[in-house]
Amino acid sequence: MQKRQFLQSALVASIAVYGLPTRAQTVDAAAVVRHYSAQVYAAYQDALAGATDMQTAIKALVDTPSPQSLAAARKTWLAAREWYLQTEAFRFYGGPIDDDKGPEGRINSWPMDESYLDYVVGKPNAGVINDRRVAISTANIIKLNERGGEENISTGWHAIEFLLWGQDLSATGPGDRSFEDYVVGKAANADRRRAYLTTVTGLLVADLNYLVKAWQPGAKNYRAKFEQGDLESVRKMIMGLGSLSRGELAGERLEVAMNTQDQEDEHSCFSDNTHRDVVGDTQGIENVWLGRYKRPDGNVLQGASLKALVAGKNPSLADKVSQQIAQSVANASAIQAPFDREIVGSKDAPGRIRIQKTIDSLVQQSKDLTEAAAVLGITKLAQAK
């Protein structure tokens, strides 16, 4: 999880624009904000549905541990992540996900000190799970999250990921935790590991349900207030996209890993799913910009978009931003698995070149988004206190 807010306000360098400019469409800020709200609601619904499917598979694992039930639980974690990642474009403006009471810190905290939660190589008795003095409850695991340090992670996607895969000790693949870690009599504290996995998964589902309710239509909730914001809400939308582009994704998740070349700075290191994390975030940004979201059943939610709003002022700029965002998605999609092999080597190593291209595109798109905000009369992208 990103603790600091990164805000981008640089001038935009000129780039070539391919094709004819977008024809200006008649949309206003209110329409864009209303459609965004519908899009956020749908995306959180899908993230919740994916997590609920994972919860079902995890129940099957703890009830009947086997290679098959462990593989099925891992598969549902990977599938659910695809939908959650696209919601990260709704962060960084003090909305329900990450305001003072928001659950983001419980949902997606990283990097994680594995030994805070469970055993690791050389420390067979490490972690909360192996400390029988600590009662396993929802309240307790919330209190334990980040206690004593930001890497002391006890909740969320990455805690679940570690409990499903274990440490990633391979240079070519993900972690390989045995299903026997959940078999009483086969592994120490298997009963507590089962209870912990069940509890932490239930908390994730509850937190996602909280976000769905915050964006539910026709209720006295955050969405109702957001839809009254017009241009101020548009400002928040653009701030979320720009902050995710530059500070979080290009910065914390890619530049840091490139600089250290350390597996510990990989976002989803246990499952080797980091390459998909990058794609999901870039896709989420594009979803918001285009006002388009493809749901798991194939249905497409389409409506008034930021692109159309900007095109009403400057069609060429709207096309420029669209092309840059599409380039970021394409560059992210070219990153190969495992990510921890992509980041190592010299400057001209193929993997490092692929990641650097993604970083460069994200940095440029954050600048372009700043220019797009300016043509709408938005010049202050810092989060209001």
Annotated model-derived regions:
Residues T26-K385:
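Mature extracytoplasmic or organellar-lumen-exposed domains after removal of signal/transit peptides
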Residues K3-L7:
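N-terminal export leaders
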